[in-house]
């Protein structure tokens, strides 16, 4: 058996897909194996997320440098973990949590901690001669996810676009992941033509989706419907729609302000707004349809639409088991978005997925808007059989890298691979 004892840990400052600094961590084992991880970063971040440590030195990268986090890995964390077993993930992560000591991991930085946590797992997988999905998921890891493709961007991810942040397609009717990716890519190219034909801009946002200026929020749904039909696919059967309006960004003084429509809505009115959209479009998933602290609104939303639509908590739940446990008991939402850097360790991420599954909820593994060539989430979604991945449009290498990794995994699994399709959802359609 290869020796999985940690020999050395080193970190460095690298760039993410937005040109901002982030942290990369290498973990070296006595066996000679190495694991490397790059930590992602979000644009719209939940107030309850683990804290990403930034330098605040305005003379470097506008204050966004991560040299403190790098130093914390190279000194405090390296000194504590060298000599430990990288294959004992729970112990590694518990040590990292204790070493930081803060609830939000703000002392050493959740970015420093996550980089080490993931690099340890990758190093241990390499030492065992296993791909990461197999190392983490064991012999039962075989489900390829339905991609939730963000093909139209608005909100914080684009300027002069819609109030709502993300409009997505989900190719649920495809027979395999490879075909799902093809369908999504063809619809994406079709959307580009639709926007172009209407005289719109085909600039892309952070996650590869187009960001045209549109007169109303519903206009975004209308042009996606046209793009799906032009590409030759059946909406509501082969392809479903999903949205992430990121409603925390719209919530002020107890109301939801839809500037594109000149309206301010109460929580109850916002729930009815979504019910109306769901009645007229084949919407299967709605993420952050209400604000992160609007618990009463979330309960109302679940009661109104929870049997028909996947109601995903992102800013609302921040991959946090405490918030998730409360949401499960209060019947607020029925699905959780899983972002590694919201909680900061692999163990806590896996705990959140397990808790969701036990409650009959779904879990959607997600990227952040600031990404890199790191493909960990592709392996994670297969390892956990989560069945859904959210990693942007089929454009920009930082997004496509994850899709390409899933193609490789599907090929490697061969006849054992199972594409989740509509089985990824626990709602009646």
Curated annotation (Swiss-Prot):
Cofactor: Mg(2+)
Catalytic activity: (2R)-2-phosphoglycerate = phosphoenolpyruvate + H2O
Binding residue positions for (2R)-2-phosphoglycerate: 165, 339, 368-369, 390
EC number of the protein: 4.2.1.11
Keyword list, A-Z: Cytoplasm, Glycolysis, Lyase, Magnesium, Metal-binding, Secreted
SMART domains assigned to the protein according to its UniProt record, in alphabetical order: Enolase_C, Enolase_N
Binding residues for Mg(2+): 244, 287, 314
GO cellular component, one term: extracellular region
Pathway: Carbohydrate degradation; glycolysis; pyruvate from D-glyceraldehyde 3-phosphate: step 4/5
Annotated catalytic residues: 207, 339
Main location: cytoplasm
Compartment list: Cytoplasm; Secreted; Cell surface
Keyword Zinc (UniProt): no
GO BP terms: glycolytic process
Cofactor info, note text: Binds a second Mg(2+) ion via substrate during catalysis.
Family named by the database record: Belongs to the enolase family.
Family annotation (NCBIfam families): eno
Function: Catalyzes the reversible conversion of 2-phosphoglycerate (2-PG) into phosphoenolpyruvate (PEP). It is essential for the degradation of carbohydrates via glycolysis.
Name by which UniProt lists this protein: Enolase
Natural source organism: Roseiflexus castenholzii (strain DSM 13941 / HLO8)
